[in-house]
Amino acid sequence: MKKISLPKIGIRPVIDGRRMGVRESLEAQTMNMAKATAALISEKLRHACGARVECVIADTCIAGMAESAACEEKFSSQNVGVTITVTPCWCYGSETIDMDPLRPKAIWGFNGTERPGAVYLAAALAAHSQKGIPAFSIYGHDVQDADDTSIPADVEEKLLRFARAGLAVASMKGKSYLSLGGVSMGIAGSIVDHNFFESWLGMKVQAVDMTELRRRIDQKIYDETELEMALAWADKHFRYGEDQNAEQYKRNETQSRAVLKESLLMAMCIRDMMQGNPKLAEKGLVEESLGYNAIAAGFQGQRHWTDQYPNGDTAEALLNSSFDWNGVREPFVVATENDSLNGVAMLMGHQLTGTAQVFADVRTYWSPDAVERVTGQPLTGRAEHGIIHLINSGSAALDGSCQQRDAQGNPTMKPHWEIEQSEADACLAATEWCPAIHEYFRGGGFSSRFLTEGGVPFTMTRVNIIKGLGPVLQIAEGWSVALPKAMHDQLDARTNSTWPTTWFAPRLTGKGPFSDVYSVMANWGANHGVLTIGHVGADFITLAAMLRIPVCMHNVEEAKIYRPSAWAAHGMDIEGQDYRACQNYGPLYKR
């Protein structure tokens, strides 16, 4: 089957169409703007899969309806999912704009004095607003000379932020969310809302009962050679941690081996269900070999599976990581407990950064007073105002141990195309695999256990659905913190020390939900959240605006907030604008 091509970014150079001197004097400058924009994007950005982003430039500058239509025909044939219109001059507004209502679009009007690029920008944006097709405005802060072909830093920042978010929109469109199972323990996020996926993300939901996973395992609908490779890899790299089970629930070596084998098979089969596997076709299993075209998935697990079969912790942890027995590769997005809304936050983070995502329970707020009472030690540094314990049953990406290093040697989580095999091995070495607690998981399993290194910038996110309002997005930028070992051990022992831990300190603003750490926890909309590496809340805000998902909570500096220009017409308070605009325009893929 032919592989689906990646979305491209279309560059639309628009120009003043008056001949006999005007257009002729602008052709080179206008096309050079387009080429510079394409070069910047191709150099700086990659798709989440690691491939370089490809730009498609219109064959000619666009002065009116005919050339605009020719450009659209070219873009339609080359899977252009995002457009950027560029110009250094006055052009004819509504005659030259991109009218596709589903495609994210921006306009860069050159800030120069020789020709009025800003005037076209304003006129074109007015047309977009009047027609109900929002567009993003890009206009440099400082005047440039007409022969200056450089892209100023502020323009570059907006071009790249727009392009990253736009590609995320285009990449999700037409894909599916694989709902493997149903509602887990009454968790609202696992009540999968088909309308949300269809109307806001342009995705389908593929609902599959967990018996399909059982069938694939029992009937050997997998690559048996790969299973042997996976087992050998686990034998080499897995370190086993403490078994906290009572003696009557502990498994012997043979039983533990069977649990490990099934856990690895679950990872293989869930992956095959998501993306397909041509090896299955070689076994005559053509239907199963196709997969479900899933860009994200969720596994119910609890309790209808886990009461008798190994839990999903090992499978989910390995799938969400940037590496496995096949080496370093793009991480998958698999939500624990089929929490589809946390899965969407994971998907957004992965599409924006190319990195693995850390799924976690937003478990406990520890105040400075409570920590000192329990441990006898004060919280200091970034933790001084309190911390949030992010911990779940072991399905977090192993990248979350932060054993990878950036160019300055700091702990981080890299996009998978930058990860060295030695860094993947270091993440594995920092992870213990602890037998699942019988009281929770009667069918057994192994939970990954690691401690995230401190001082790493993270952005925590969550999507929630509010009846009568629709989806909303929460964002909290902050840092992981390293606690003194004795303090960590005491606090960790009070919950479940066989699970992975991140101690998180959000950045406080002194206002609203970020007035203190307690308020961050109190305003969080659900029991789960996602950690994405870096302070990338501004990228999430831009992406949410494209999808018409209002942001109900964030601590991003106002200067970094970048939304379509029409948002400014929806009032003077910037967050109220977001709500009113999202309500006015409705979901991107209205149904």
Swiss-Prot record:
Its EC number is 5.3.1.25. GO terms for cellular component: cytoplasm. GO terms for molecular function: arabinose isomerase activity; L-fucose isomerase activity; manganese ion binding. SUPFAM superfamilies: FucI/AraA C-terminal domain-like, FucI/AraA N-terminal and middle domains. It is found in: Cytoplasm. Pfam families: Fucose_iso_C, Fucose_iso_N1, Fucose_iso_N2. Its cofactor is Mn(2+). It catalyses: L-fucose = L-fuculose. Keywords: Carbohydrate metabolism, Cytoplasm, Fucose metabolism, Isomerase, Manganese, Metal-binding. Mn(2+) binds at residues 337, 361, 528. The active site is at residues 337, 361. One of its GO terms (biological process) is D-arabinose catabolic process. Pathway: Carbohydrate degradation; L-fucose degradation; L-lactaldehyde and glycerone phosphate from L-fucose: step 1/3. The keyword Electron transport does not apply. It comes from the Bacteria. Belongs to the L-fucose isomerase family. NCBIfam families: fucI (TIGR01089), PRK10991.1 (NF008220). Homohexamer. Converts the aldose L-fucose into the corresponding ketose L-fuculose. This is L-fucose isomerase. It comes from Klebsiella pneumoniae subsp. pneumoniae (strain ATCC 700721 / MGH 78578). The gene is fucI.
